């Protein structure tokens, strides 16, 4: 099982790359979770992309308050967009393994340890992903089990190779360098950039793996978008595979996700009011029990 071997001096180190655009609400919690780990990451790189809110100030304050944390702040101001910002961070990272997730993601306290273990134990693994827990929905851990059972079965391409999920993914640095100049820049912004990375890896016969113990908490805020916006987002699955006709898939995750949308669209704002009334920060509380065990 991936990630179960004891941590040794030979374990590969892990850089974390977090693209950020106007993420003042969640970036501090994201950094707390990224640095409250059983194994400290080699570095945590926040790449700001022309934020107009206080994202930069929040990150700078975090670095001041936590000088021992290996957090770095970079700026990608040449071009607005997730892909150039992501690429800038990955290209500047210096670790053996490059973790990448969004600024509203709260990784489990053993995430770095598990990710390091995956790639250390399997030298053929070039990309890795795992399930997610929706921290701002009720029954979070039940949702995690559901996500795991579904994602490991249907989030795949070609002959069953796992597709990486942008909210919870890692690449071997050598693998990234092999595809960095080839990944789609998607100027029209119509594709899923994480699936695009996955397909470029598979196109070079580079192995991707799925690890149930590689867990990240993410927001379900996508369910709060308008029906038109949501359906447009779902079309990105098809658009990405259409851009890579040499690859195929047996399952279409967007069908299941779209089926869940009506109920989740109604539930999400109601649950946010419950959390606000109770003065609960769901991102801060995502892994509080696990973090207490580290204290």
Specify the residue positions occupied by each region the protein language model found.
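Glycine-rich, basic loop-to-helix element that forms the pyrophosphate-binding segment
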Residues: 76-93
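A conserved acidic beta->alpha catalytic loop
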Residues: 33, 48-57, 78, 105
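Short, well-formed alpha-helical segments that are part of the catalytic scaffolds
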Residues: 23-36
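Conserved donor NDP-sugar-binding/catalytic core segment of glycosyltransferases
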Residues: 110-141
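Short, flexible, basic/aromatic active-site loop/helix in glycosyltransferases
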Residues: 130-131, 142-162
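Short aromatic/hydrophobic "clamp" motif used to bind/position activated sugar donors
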Residues: 98
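Acidic donor-binding loop at a coil-to-helix junction in glycosyltransferase catalytic cores
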Residues: 188-197
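Terminal low-complexity segments of carbohydrate-biosynthetic enzymes
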Residues: 242-295
């Amino acid at each position: 099982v991936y990630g179960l071997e004891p941590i040794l001096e030979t374990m590969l180190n892990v850089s974390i790359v977090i693209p950020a655009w106007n993420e003042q609400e969640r970036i501090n919690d994201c950094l707390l979770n990224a640095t409250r780990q059983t194994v400290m990451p080699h570095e945590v790189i926040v790449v700001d992309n022309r934020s107009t809110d206080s994202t930069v100030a929040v990150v700078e304050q975090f670095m001041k308050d936590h000088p021992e944390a290996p957090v770095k702040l970079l700026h990608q101001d040449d071009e607005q967009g997730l892909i150039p910002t992501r690429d800038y961070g990955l290209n500047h990272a210096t670790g053996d393994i490059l973790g990448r997730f969004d600024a509203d993601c709260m990784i489990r306290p053993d995430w770095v340890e598990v990710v390091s273990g995956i790639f250390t134990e399997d030298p053929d693994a070039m990309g890795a992903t795992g399930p997610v827990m929706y921290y701002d929905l009720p029954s979070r851990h039940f949702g995690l089990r559901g996500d795991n059972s579904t994602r490991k079965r249907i989030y795949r391409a070609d002959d069953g190779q796992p597709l990486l999920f942008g909210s919870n993914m890692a690449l071997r640095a050598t693998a990234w360098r092999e595809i960095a100049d080839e990944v789609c820049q998607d100027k029209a912004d119509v594709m899923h950039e994480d699936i695009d990375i996955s397909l470029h890896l598979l196109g070079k016969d580079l192995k991707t793996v799925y690890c149930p113990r590689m867990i990240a908490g993410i927001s379900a805020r996508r369910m709060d978008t308008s029906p038109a916006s949501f359906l447009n987002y779902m079309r990105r699955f098809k658009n990405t595979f259409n851009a890579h006709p040499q690859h195929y898939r047996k399952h279409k995750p967007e069908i299941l996700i779209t089926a869940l949308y009506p109920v989740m669209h109604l539930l999400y704002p109601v649950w946010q009011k419950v959390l606000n009334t109770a003065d609960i920060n769901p991102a801060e509380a995502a892994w509080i029990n696990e973090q207490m065990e580290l204290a």
